[in-house]
Amino acid sequence: TANIARLLAKQGNKVFIIDADINTPSMNTEFEGDHPHEMIWVHSSGNMFSKFIYLEKSMVRQYLELAKKKIHSINPDYVLIDTPPSVTNVHIELLSRVKVSYVLFVTQPTKLSNQDVLRTMDFFHERCGKVNCGIVENMCYGTEHNEYPIRLVAQIPMQDNMNTENLLTNAYNEFQKIVDEIVQSDIVVLEEYSTENGYDENFDVTDIHITGSRKHYFTHELKY
């Protein structure tokens, strides 16, 4: 996520990063402060709750709501959401507030990692519908060939001694493939559902059945 943001910023785009790995944030170590670069803004729990080792649900909601306010204020060209490897309640909270236009699944070319990605894919398809998505293989040796149900966008090579300091330079072409994919997918990477400009009927219960003197509410579908 950090290197994609750096490359987008280098090409003149305003980038806002939401660190959705609440318990073990990393964007606060990748970047210094909330506005580390002229074109990059970082929203990380590592900056906001640096003295906490556990965040209550209300704090997570506060964190996500503040992210939405920052989007209004910054008006970025791209919003990148860095998520933990496994699905958490934060994913569910986040997807109840936002609509994503592209999901990038990062995996390693191993059987176990591939299985995890396939399970995560099912979750996002259920929550996001038919959204554009792709796979990035990380820590590759260039000899493996894996089949995926969606497009393989890029393969990031294994670095000597696991040193990722110059990763963007060493794998520039692969990161450019990712950026090209994101740029072509949609003009807006993330948009929020809002009632700010009036009542939003997307949140309506689509069917209510009333029987006799008692009211029974059957929710057939909730549009998020």
Region locations from a protein language model:
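Walker A/P-loop NTP-binding active-site region of P-loop NTPases
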Residues: 1-38, 78
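Glycine-rich, phosphate-binding/catalytic loops in enzymes
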Residues: 33, 59-61, 96-99
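C-terminal lobe/tail of nucleotide-utilizing enzymes
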Residues: 125-224
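Conserved catalytic-core segment of NTP-binding enzymes
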Residues: 70-74, 78, 84-161
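Amphipathic alpha-helical transducer elements in NTP-driven molecular machines
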Residues: 57, 61-65, 111-118, 168, ...
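A short helix-to-beta-strand connector/capping loop
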Residues: 35-44, 131, 151
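Cytosolic-facing regulatory segments adjacent to core modules
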Residues: 44, 48-88
